[in-house]
Amino acid sequence: MKKRVGILTSGGDCPGLNATIRGVAKALYARMGDNVEIVGILNGYHGLINGEYREMCEDDFRGILTLGGTILGTKRTPFKLMRVVEDDKVDKVAAMKKTYKDAKLDCLLCLGGNGTHKTANLLSQEGLNIIGLPKTIDNDIYGTDVTFGFHTAVDIATEVIDRIHTTAGSHSRVMCIEIMGNKAGWLTLYLSLIHI
């Protein structure tokens, strides 16, 4: 019996999104062969709310390993309260459940950060089969040691800082560097330990 697996990316961009999507697809095809169909939910939860999805095939996952961004698209617009009907009069939870049902999904993989996982948890409580894939350069998702995107962010920031050192030295200057991380300091901590 074929299983239909949906996958979405939500929230901000981070390194490794397409590599993760590709890895999931390759694992599903390797394990299940012709018994799996992958459905790409376009533009994150907005696509799930608005019924924006498409059937995907193995060719869709070729050549994306090193591409930045996400082939599925994403939206970062936060929802004030997922269960509250806002000015647009759309019951977001009901709309997402409808798309899940209309797409005949057996499971939905949600690749994202804290906000993505809060919504994924809500959908799980609503009875949908959900798998959360933690993605954020902040490395601050509860219950994980390392999230997708974190180590790449460390590597890239390290390279940038190393280059700034030479510029600062050439001009006898001190430079201040602001590092992302939202409310978590993991990225800054790792970078400071590398540059001691």
Regions found by a protein language model. Give the residues of each.
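Conserved small/polar residues in nucleotide/adenosyl-binding loops
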Residues: I194-I196
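Polyanion-binding loop/helix "lid" in catalytic or ligand-binding cores
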Residues: T158-Y190
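Short, acidic/small-residue loops that bind anionic groups at enzyme active sites
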Residues: L123-T147, H151-I156
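Glycine-rich beta-alpha junction loops
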Residues: L42-H46, I137, I179-A184
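Gly/Ser/Thr-rich loops at beta-strand to alpha-helix junctions
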Residues: G11-P15, L111-K118, G181-G185
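A cross-family phosphate/adenosyl-ligand binding-site feature
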Residues: M1-S10, T20-K104, G115
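Short Gly/Thr/Asp-enriched flexible loops that form oxyanion-binding sites at enzyme active sites
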Residues: T20-V24, N114-L128, T188
